[in-house]
């Protein structure tokens, strides 16, 4: 609930249930300055058990319902590449998300064109594959401190 007050967008909506909950919370708090809350739907295009997100099949089944939520604007899709192997290892993941986005947007133009993919170790490849938003915190702020 606090996130909808603190953030301009949420990039990790990994289920229709979470989208529905966010929509309800935004609605309960009244109209947001600037309109609906922009969200990116997290897609696990690799079926990696270590990652959260819609599978491509789940997204296809549930997208229309999420797009119909009045207090959310689906700005695009988000994914995380493989954690090992560097940028080239993540290229197929990024290409699959771009292709999925193109196909889904051809069927329903309410889905935003944003592609949030790429982090510090693979953002160059993500941009080559069409990323419109990269997450490069470690490149800007350095490594996270080890837990105490």
Which residues are covered by each model-predicted region?
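Conserved alpha/beta-domain cores
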Residues: 1-123, 127-129, 138-143
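Active-site loop ensemble at the mouth of alpha/beta enzyme cores that anchors a bound cofactor
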Residues: 146-148
């Amino acid at each position: 609930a606090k996130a909808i007050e603190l953030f301009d967008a949420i990039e990790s909506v990994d289920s229709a249930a979470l989208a529905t909950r966010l929509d309800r919370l935004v609605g309960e708090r009244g109209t947001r300055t600037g309109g609906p809350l922009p969200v990116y739907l997290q897609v696990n295009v690799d079926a990696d058990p270590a990652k959260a997100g819609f599978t491509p099949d789940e997204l296809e089944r549930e997208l229309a319902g999420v797009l119909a939520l009045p207090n959310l604007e689906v700005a695009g899709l988000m994914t995380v590449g493989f954690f090992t192997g560097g940028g080239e290892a993540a290229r197929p993941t990024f290409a699959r998300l771009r292709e999925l986005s193109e196909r889904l947007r051809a069927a329903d133009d309410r889905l935003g064109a944003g592609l949030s993919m790429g982090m510090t170790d693979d953002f160059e490849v993500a941009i080559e594959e069409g990323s419109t938003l990269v997450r490069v915190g470690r490149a800007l702020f350095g490594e996270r401190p080890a837990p105490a």
